[in-house]
Amino acid sequence: MKELEKYSTCLKRIDEFSQNLGIKKKDRTIFKMKQSENENEKCLVLENGSFDSPEPWFVIDENDEIHTLLSLQSLKNILESLKQSQKENFELRLEKAIYQQIPVDFNDVWTVAMDEIKQKAQNGTMEVSIDLEKLISKIKQEHPNLFVDMQAMIERVNQNERL
C-alpha cells in the first residue's frame, strides 16, 4: 500500500511539472527504474508514454525520486537560453547603472564600461560578480566629461536666480 501511495505522489509531482512545461498527460513518458540481476545494472521499464514522446522523459527510481532524461541537444538549447538570459540581465543592469549616473552620451559610457568589463574578464573576474554601480562610479570619477555635472548645473541655476 505504501508503495502505491509513493508512486501516486510521484505521478502527481510529474503531473504538476508536466503542466508547467505544457506537456499533455498523454504525451509524457514515464519510466520506472528497477534493479536487475546484475548489481551494476538498472532496468528502465516504460510505464507510460512512448519512445517518440517529447522530452523530458521522467524516471522514478527505487527510492521514489524523480529524474529526467534529456537529449544532449535539448540540454545544449537550455544552457544557451540560460546564457542568453544571463547576458540580457547583465546588460540591463549595466544600462540601469549608467542611466543612474546621468550620462552625456550613453553609448560613450557603455563603450568605456564594456572595455573595463572585458579587461576584468581577461584578469579572471566573472561578469556576474562585477559591481556595476561601483564600476560606473569609477568611470565617472576617471571620465567626468562623460556625465552631466549636476552640482555645476545647480550652481548655475542658483546664480541665474540671483541675477
UniProtKB/Swiss-Prot annotation:
Pfam families listed in its UniProt record: DUF2603 (PF10788)
InterPro entries given in the database record: UPF0763 (IPR019724)
Family: Belongs to the UPF0763 family.
HAMAP family the record matches: UPF0763 (MF_02110)
Name the record gives this protein: UPF0763 protein Cj0993c
Organism listed in the record: Campylobacter jejuni subsp. jejuni serotype O:2 (strain ATCC 700819 / NCTC 11168)
Lineage, uppermost ranks: Bacteria, Pseudomonadati, Campylobacterota, Epsilonproteobacteria, Campylobacterales
